[in-house]
């Protein structure tokens, strides 16, 4: 049996969710449907038009140290291009080392493109300033800001790029919960150790992540980057160690429901257990209803959130929601070893979601 991993991004979907499938799960016992939870979710994603591939190698990177060692090594081996898309590049030791390495790759003839979110940079306590961007560009690195703030600023509040994507030569990709910052290794004084999850992917799912990057890049820069050089063929033969990966993407100003429907569908499909780790647990109405109904069916629902947070009052808001779920029958754990920023969910020990998506209205 192949492991299923569904990667969930915090942007609006380009596609419409299949609400009828979710409705059937709300009213029918799982046994009467006759499908395991992973098969139900795969069917939902396929009918929603979500890209799914089954010839992937996936390596989970369970710490900042693991992520940056692996990413830097892949960048050193790059031959054609390096694409980076992050919510922010914090101007610290890790970012400085990264841009030094990227500058060296430019000298070797490798194309380097990097993109960061304007709000993510502004809200960062060590932002990239004009002088930093000037130096980076002088080294031959193309770096652009996603959706710079213009008047009226309120129009840009929810139109943000929360992705964390790296694509190397179209053959290796990285995604997950980590931006570029040294606190993923060193922690922060007020909250302690910063724990997060990232992953390295090889296989056809790399093409899906490349397509996401190039779509946003070309829109922001008015360029037309693309072609076969950016989408090398991957080995089509699969074996039992390969992993099925589905990329659930959200694109601002399109459809606000795909991500919440994908989460809700995953929860409704559960037959035995749902395990959730999420740092900002303020679920939408649809996800909250899915959790209530799944608990009422006797499914074991376990949720872990951090007692510390980088955003004030977030733990208080989460506890209010979690108290209601505990009264319903959920098991709740508080993580006290620092800040657990991972965004993961496991269902029936059959599939998991990993990504940048928080369980809140954004």
Which role fits each region the language model picked out?
Residues 4-13:
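Sec-dependent N-terminal signal peptides
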Residues 15-362:
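Charged, low-complexity intrinsically disordered terminal segments
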